[in-house]
């Protein structure tokens, strides 16, 4: 599902970025992306093993936005962790979609975290992004094609 989802987003002219809290080096992740035939669909990747902060720190999200040359309003973050992914992305001004992960439990946090979308699967992000793009274009007075 990951490849078809990323391809559908790329076909819409969207950039794909990765921001990962990890102890592994970039080479490890690149091998995984090549193994899964995803490497050609990823435009930028930022790993906490290479920067002085990790999600949910604002600078982690700013780093991936900078790597993609995007503003927060132009980006959507998809993740499975309410605190690290949703809260962190929203604090920098991005929209955030949550894919609840059964192995992570309810991930209770001390503050209210409300994702902009909750997805049952990764593939659902395509329809959500299509809707958000139409809303974004309408707010700017443009017509989506």
Positions of PLM-derived features:
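Asp-based, Mg2+/Mn2+-dependent phosphohydrolase catalytic module
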Residues: 3, 7-10, 17-145
